[in-house]
């Protein structure tokens, strides 16, 4: 506390202790007591101020302190006032109290050489090894002042000579002793030339070679700096090392020369074996500095002068060869290896070798050279990684470097183990465990399999760079002379190498021969394109089955054509369902339009529902601009021309979809001003005959999980709404965001479609409709929020989408959702869905109108059936539907 804030009585007590006025201190501490006859001479009488302070009433505390934390006892001890110190101790003053700088009363007495006061404090339990915030002990401050009697008293009381704090105790500052300067009592006595104290400390076993950790100076160097020959002689006689070097690479002899102490220099000259460096030697850098500068000649001179320099280590345990490998200087690496540098030495921090450093920094030529020179590829760093493991951790590893290390590792495995590492190990393979590559069970792991997968990854990445951006491998190029409709779609790669779904035979033949048109070669590339466009990482190698990444729930600006409001009020007051699905690609066993379609059905395509004019099943042979009607096959055919860029947008963002819709709306605005009549669209199903067609199994992908149409052979009535179709009042905006993973074979495709069809059959009550129910949409929302565990709650309470959009926080709690974070996620989704409904409805109506106008304008330019281009999987109007097997 500041002195100005002290009470008058406290100020009087501190002043009396500083001056040794025991009488005033007694009157302040013991109101009503008799004056003490032992007041020291020279002490000023307190006078009327003390009397007024005493008359004020309250007694003064004995441990009061000033603004620096100095107590009354410390002030009395520093002044050497023994009677006052004795009186304060009798009144209960704390003997080990510290001021703000860590000084105690004993340190104050030792600093000033008051032996009697120090003895009195020691008798009352003062800490003889106390240290201040700078790490100076009681013995150090006494030695600095040259107080031989106090030093002897402290040593006899048990003071530590070198006070190295072996117990690890902390100083008053809170820092450990090792963080301080490390000045011992002997160094303090030598620095100030107290020869008698030096002799006493040496007799008590002081270390003459203790050095200050910051500057590296020893007591002998301090004596040489001071110029005390007698002190230097004492230290040398007690074993001081004259060859000790400080941080400036100087000995005590050089210090004496610099200070021009000729007598000291003459005495130390014959004792010192480390001679001073010449000016040229001082200017010459060491081998590490020469490597950093890239000075080949200087490194060669240093290595020629002393070959041991090539294996020196720095503070991190790194060698010159490691530094050269990091910097990528092949000539220096060759020079060091020729000078017998240890290629397999590991640093002390991470355990890396020169080969690991060169591998990690991508210095391929150095890696080749070190491998040719016999560097050990099996050495592991402290984290267990080898050089091959490090190159696999790089974001963009060099293919040749990976191949080089892999071949060497496989050769080592073959030479040492006799079998590839991915096979079941023999009994003697335990000896290879410390260096063998981590492997998976059986033939799914091992070095060879690992390299095979990595090679596939690099090959496919290079192939993708040759394709047009966003072009899927299994889809035909858009017509260059016709407008492209920028809509979003979701496609799935074909599972087998079939070219008969590419439309015209000549196009299929060309696609089969050429690289970009081969579905088998590039079916995984489509998924790679989707994954890269979505910004998804590669958790596994591309040769494995890549699963589509489902993005989180989109922000309020999200809008997707297939996820907007699916009910629309017509001028006549009826509801218009807005969500339908285009005809699927027909299987090879059930040709519906295009010649020779793929039996496994390619990627299912999702489009927004489009309101059309009434359909006429009887006029199936005529052109109808509704692709959803029984006679809409030609409409679907024309759709392929308009949807050129349709398949290139798989996995795109919602913002890109909006921009594409806006561009298309501008293009199609002037084509037709006629507004389509609002009428219910017919169910999905391409047909050219008067009888309704049968839907082949595993053709349509719908719902949040892209489930397929049921495999049951129920027929769709084009005049009726599917019984489990979308409700006319449903207002869900749950989008289907991602494509299904690309299966690798027909068997997998069939099993997946069968199981998903069975699930959809259950949810839709056995209907073969391709539309999405409220339950599917609600399930999709919960899946996107990663809250599938709450789905049974909504199913049990029969909560549909319309009820879901009205839920509040209290409703969710009543349903049993107790987690605050989960409720907030659901409420945010509900708010987002409700907020964007009006805007989505308006944009969707305009898009549908423009879409309809485009179809009407293309009706007048319909091509001849033989010349009309037909995309893969699309139906032709002149072909009939074959019956299901």
From Swiss-Prot:
The entry's keywords: ANK repeat, Cell projection, Cilium, Cytoplasm, Disease variant, Hydroxylation, Phosphoprotein, Repeat
Cytoplasm found in the keyword field: yes
PTM-bearing positions, type Phosphoserine: 650, 734, 742
Residues with 3-hydroxyasparagine modification: 129
Site (Essential for ANKS3 interaction): 823
InterPro entries xref list: Ankyrin-KH/SAM_domain (IPR051631), Ankyrin_rpt (IPR002110), Ankyrin_rpt-contain_sf (IPR036770), SAM (IPR001660), SAM/pointed_sf (IPR013761)
Locations listed in the record: Cell projection, Cilium; Cytoplasm
Polar residues: compositionally biased ranges: 650-662, 855-865
GO cellular component, one term: cytoplasm
Molecular function in Gene Ontology: identical protein binding
The protein's assembly and partners: Homooligomer. Interacts with NEK8. Central component of a complex containing at least ANKS6, INVS, NEK8 and NPHP3. ANKS6 may organize complex assembly by linking INVS and NPHP3 to NEK8 and INVS may target the complex to the proximal ciliary axoneme. Interacts (via SAM domain) with BICC1 (via KH domains) in an RNA-dependent manner. Interacts (via SAM domain) with ANKS3 (via SAM domain).
The record's note on its domains: The ankyrin repeats are necessary and sufficient for NEK8-binding.
Name of the protein: Ankyrin repeat and SAM domain-containing protein 6
Organism of origin: Rattus norvegicus
